[in-house]
Amino acid sequence: MIMNRFQITADVDVTLWLGVLTKYKRQSNKIEYTNLEELFESENVYFPTRDELKNQLRTVTKNLEYEFLAYLRELTDKSLFKIDNAAVYLPLSDEAFIAQFGRVSMFVNGTFDTVVETSASQEDVFDVVERALNMAMDSENLRVENLDALSTACLDIREIGD
């Protein structure tokens, strides 16, 4: 049986909710994370530290990788669909966004990457990987305190030559 190798990549988009500034009346804008502390302290509102957010992103990363592999194994025949690991990278940004009514969020633009070895067609690989990734994204195990949204975009599958 001929096994083909496929490089699979996707963008992983995360929104972290940081809180609401009730007295903020200016236009929506981007702001450096370090400048937010002063705004939150002026309203006596809890504000998550960068370390807390980094730990939450580490948890999401680890659990997303685990859940993806678990769902992939559930959806496929292990002897026909081989995968060793999946890598998710979610770098914490230095900027946050304050919406019109004071809602403060941080957007994380991350990546997903893996290699699959299978006898399935490229279309079948796309369908299975997309489904496993969506199931993993919907998993309750990914929930962390400040996670507001999690999605993938630009799923790309390329065959790797010999």
Please state what every model-predicted region is.
Residues 2-8, 98-108:
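Short structural boundary motif marking the start of a folded domain
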Residues 10-18, 108-120:
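Beta-strand elements of well-folded, non-transmembrane domains
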Residues 1-6, 116-133:
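Intrinsically disordered low-complexity regions specifically enriched for long asparagine
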